[in-house]
Amino acid sequence: MKKKITETSSIMFSSPKNQQSKQYINENVWDDQYLIDVYEKSINQYIEAHNEKNKKNRNKNKEINNVEDDISNNNNNNNSNNKTIDNNKNKIGSKNNINNNSTTTNTNKNKINKQKQQQQNNLDKETDTKDDYNSGDYYNEYEDDNGEDNDYQERKGYYQSNKDHDYYHNGENNYQNQYNPNYFYQSQHYQQQQPPQNFNNQYQPHHHHHHHQQYPNHHSYNYNREQYQNPYSQPPPTPTNYPPMQTNFQPPPMPTILPQGDDELADLLLSWYYSGYYTGVYQERKRNSRLNQTPHPNHINHHRYNNNNNNNNNNNNNNNNNNNNNNNNNNNSNNNNNNNNNNNNNKSNSNSNNKKLPKFTNIPKTKETN
């Protein structure tokens, strides 16, 4: 897809629209007309953006648009205010109706309650007067000047005092523990710590009455203690499947065999090589070169090293065998020496036995005692 493109003396390529007098023809240049058009468009946009006339027109348009936006916002605000006023009026009217209805209902209820109270009071008075008339006392001795019944007040106070007494003794209003901040927590904790009572298993044989069955131990936990007491006792995390890092990594030398007759492929090969990627072409050439070339000196040294190790091992084995033979010979010589010593000892013993004892002729005679 190569084409003849005109080239100027400058760095950038010239488009066919702006052809200058100095033109050079180069057949090895790719057709980048699309990129040239994009560059021209971007340059024209930059020039238009920094043109003063265009700036003034843009500022005017912005001012006009801002004024129009302000007018529209004011209209919207007025409409919203009118709507809120209407809604408030409707709410106020509904509230007034509700209040009127509620006041009427409340007044009716109060009237009914007053009538009921009057009827009950009349009944109480009638019963009291009947009792007084039957007992001979037509008048009420317990009424004050104001007409209040002292007996009713005393009875009312008696009931209230009894209620307070029960309330205090039931613990609902415990004044002693009122200023104890831990009272509520202690009572709640005590209720929670009570063991469950199983009445079915209450009468069991003797071997069933164990402490740990009816009352479970408070040290029984549902979690592993070692996990919290010694966090370092956990096993280490499993290693990932990533390959280990190569510390002594040495890249191979730059390939000396380049494709002949194809400069573009050679450029690509060098660019990919320097960027860290190896192409399939280089890998194929490397495989072919392995078949034709001599092995790498490192590989030769490696084999030599292995051969030397094997030879050294064989020599060591031979030396060990020789040492074992020498040890055996030494043992044999020691055995021979021991045998010779035994023979000498036997001879000396026999000689000592064959010797004659000396004759003691001058032994003094003892006197016989009567």
Swiss-Prot record:
Disordered: region residues: 1-21, 66-154, 189-218, 291-370
Bias (Acidic residues) ranges: 140-151
Coiled-coil zones: 39-135
Chief localisation class: nucleus
Compositional bias of kind Low complexity: 72-122, 189-204, 306-354
GO cellular component, one term: cytoplasm
Domain of life according to the entry: Eukaryota
UniProt keyword annotation of Coiled coil present: yes
Comp. bias (Basic and acidic residues): 123-133
Sequence ranges of Polar residues compositional bias: 7-21
Compartment(s) of residence: Nucleus, Gem; Cytoplasm
Entry's Gene Ontology BP terms: mRNA processing; RNA splicing
Keyword Cytoplasm belongs to the record: yes
Family: Belongs to the SMN family.
Function statement: May play an essential role in spliceosomal snRNP assembly in the cytoplasm and may be required for pre-mRNA splicing in the nucleus.
Name assigned to this protein: Component of gems protein 1
Gene symbol of the encoding locus: gemin1
